[in-house]
Amino acid sequence: MRRVLMVNFGVLLLFCFGVLSNSFGQDNGGDSDINSTTAVYIVTLRQASSLHLFQQEAEEVKRVRDQSKHGDTSKFTRPKLQPRNISRSRYWRSRRSAIAQAHDSLLRNALKGEKYIKLYSFHYLINGFAVFVSSQQAETLSRRREVANIVLDFSVRTATTYTPQFMGLPKGAWVKEGGYETAGEGIVIGFIDTGIDPTHPSFNGTDTSQRQYPIPNHFSGVCEVTPDFPSGSCNRKLVGARHFAQSAITRGIFNSSEDYASPFDGDGHGTHTASIAAGNHGVSAVVSGHNFGSASGIAPRAHISVYKALYKSFGGFAADVVAAIDQAAQDGVDILSLSITPNRRPPGVATFFNPLDMAMLSAVKAGIFVVQAAGNTGPSPKSMSSFSPWIFTVGAASHDRDYSNSIVLGNNVSIPGVGLALRTDEGKKYTMISALDALKNKSSVVDKDMYVGECQDYGSFDKDVIRGNLLICSYSIRFVLGLSTIKQALAVAKNLSAKGVVFYMDPYVLGFQINPTPMDMPGIIIPSAEDSKVLLKYYNSSLVRDGTTKEIVRFGAVAAIAGGQNANFSNRAPKIMYYSARGPDPQDSLFNDADILKPNLVAPGNSIWGAWSSAATESTEFEGESFAMMSGTSMAAPHVAGVAALVKQKFRKFSPSAIASALSTTSVLFDNKGEAIMAQRAYANPDQTISPATPFDMGNGFVNATAALDPGLIFDTSFEDYMSFLCGINGSAPVVFNYTGTNCLRNNATISGSDLNLPSITVSKLNNTRTVQRLMTNIAGNETYTVSLITPFDVLINVSPTQFSIASGETKLLSVILTAKRNSSISSFGGIKLLGNAGHIVRIPVSVTVKIASKQ
């Protein structure tokens, strides 16, 4: 008897969409009610999906026609389907209907007389459905011969004005694409996220130059129409928008008024990520009345299609996400951007075998480049939350702009801080008053300790004491949790006629990044607990008290706030952010490593300006604003999605792996000061605050948009290669067959991860010697390349050939022999650099972990 595979792991940012079906199945006379053991299951069937069947039949037609050209068709039967004579849309409609009917028939026959709710029928990327049933019914379904796999649905939750300049787009990649006026035009980027605010100028159907967008004829998506997403919300820029919440609705946790039963973004995250990748060029980013510059997406003329599957009140569920991926592929998106990661490793034979990664594998087979955030679970080794080689995983790095603020005390000590705030009057210092020393009821000890110091309640304070002075407030964990807000403290300070606000850090607030927050009055947040102690020590030592009563008779501490609305561009950058998830890539839940490099790349992800929804609530400090500054790998991924759109625009026939190769081999290893890129809490030196980054911190390096448009050589990987890799995993044959229909027993060419034709070489265990090969294709002109090596510690590298000439369109094989020089379990890193005489530089990082030398 086949067992039901129970998978229950959370995900750090997911969005979804699919073929919506809310069919309620009940056999005649059935009276068995759905009980407390019911749950949503994702069921995969053995029959191939529409996409796989279409491609198989198309290949068969081609084979017959090729044979006909040679005059021999006796051994072949012409397939019933001839893709040349039937439109894809007609084919998909017929297949969708047939597969959905088959799903309904299976459920009726298997669950006779019992109740169930089918949520979705998946037909395009995978053949299966999501269904709400009891555990006993799930067991019954698992015994059906048509059923390949049953997985318990799991919960999911959420995980630029300047960055185009920092990435060199205005004088580089945009110029190569004809300027920002055409950069990304004709390419559709799909976003699985929290939706979008269609009223934002970043998504207008005409850009700031009033040029209308063309119609992307290859795209067939639609726009939902609802009261809060009315007709006309979409245009030639925003070409598709849908929402999916069937799993949440079935569970009874969906609140339509709060979560918006439409593609409208009530959270803000989806609007932000979409604008980073493809927001219109030249949109003014005004926050709290201050203009912070003109915003632009990385591919400002690319089209956007939104698939909403995350919601502000509960997050989301995997069944909806799989449906979203399935629908996006049917619609014809070119790029798929997911700022999502599981917060626990998927159980089973390998991390790659889960419904999301398998759906994304089929999307890649359909020609879609899939970008995923690495996760914000760094900096620990093996904290990577995006696993599969067909997914392009992006970590987060800084850029050189910051909005520094500071406060100068009366003793001339300057303390750094954050806050997009006004400055106090130049050359003048103001008296500081602690909120705890300005209470109307000074005997309320509990309130003083627990709440009042956060300056959230106007009625607690004596206005006469605070008027015209700087109010000192505490920043506690309640701000992190959203129970207290900067915005409320500022409102209180204004009502009290304070001149400004100073927030000091509660010592219990550890490990949280405090982003610059908009303030419509002078203010500053001191993020360091140690610096906060300096402030408080000065303040307390400056108080003058009555010798008998100990009451304060004079506040002696004074200070001036420098303000933080002006940007500085002097930081050393990029550097890898501490929260960005690190490699090595975990192959399974037992901490075994995969021979796959993760992350693939890093991109700007820290303090990123992006469009913000008018109803957004994810960041209370930006509530009501049209732009917000956010940080995370969620912000890094759409940067790469935008660059991928530029690459796809130039090279229309590039496969997803070719795009990945172009992005990877051209990446940057040095910062703006010409030094090696650094990482906070780097993999090799986790105890040091900052040290040189390794491939396990930054993958191939920092994204280089301009160079990616002229990579010289590419390394292409096929769907069949991925199948050979999956079949090469010990014990994977049954699950590979269940998910893909591929029989590993008939696949003689199994390979390891290091044998995949990737633009990197990763070996988790080097036992004496291993030879790996890479097949290179020249997409530029004739060129001669010379090999340069950086040898990993304790590893010997031999590369053949050491020099080669390659014609345009030609392919050549590069052979690399790795030999362990001595036993070691410490990871070592190096690289292979191919220097072309026409100026191309192709970089291949080499990572080796465990090394076992031969006995002499």
Swiss-Prot record:
Domain PA: 432-528
Location of this chain's protein in the cell: Secreted
SUPFAM superfamilies in the record: Subtilisin-like
GO CC annotations, alphabetized: extracellular region
Glycan-modified residues: 35, 85, 204, 255, 412, 441, 495, 540, 568, 704, 730, 738, 748, 767, 782, 823
Main location: secreted
InterPro entries xref list: Peptidase_S8/S53_dom (IPR000209), Peptidase_S8/S53_dom_sf (IPR036852), Peptidase_S8_Asp-AS (IPR023827), Peptidase_S8_Ser-AS (IPR023828), Peptidase_S8_subtilisin-rel (IPR015500), Peptidases_S8_3 (IPR034197), S8pro/Inhibitor_I9 (IPR010259), SBT (IPR045051)
EC number: 3.4.21.-
Domain of life the protein comes from: Eukaryota
Active-site residues per Swiss-Prot or TrEMBL entry: 193 (charge relay system), 269 (charge relay system), 634 (charge relay system)
Keywords: Autocatalytic cleavage, Glycoprotein, Hydrolase, Protease, Secreted, Serine protease, Signal, Zymogen
Cleaved signal peptide residues: 1-21
Positions of the Peptidase S8 domain: 164-709
Residue intervals of the Inhibitor I9 domain: 40-159
Keyword Transport: no
Proregion span(s): 22-159
GO molecular function per UniProt: serine-type endopeptidase activity
Gene Ontology biological process terms, A to Z: proteolysis
Family membership noted in the UniProt record: Belongs to the peptidase S8 family.
Alphabetical list of PANTHER family matching this protein: PROPROTEIN CONVERTASE SUBTILISIN/KEXIN
Name of the protein described by the UniProt record: Subtilisin-like protease SBT2.2
Lineage: Eukaryota, Viridiplantae, Streptophyta, Embryophyta, Tracheophyta
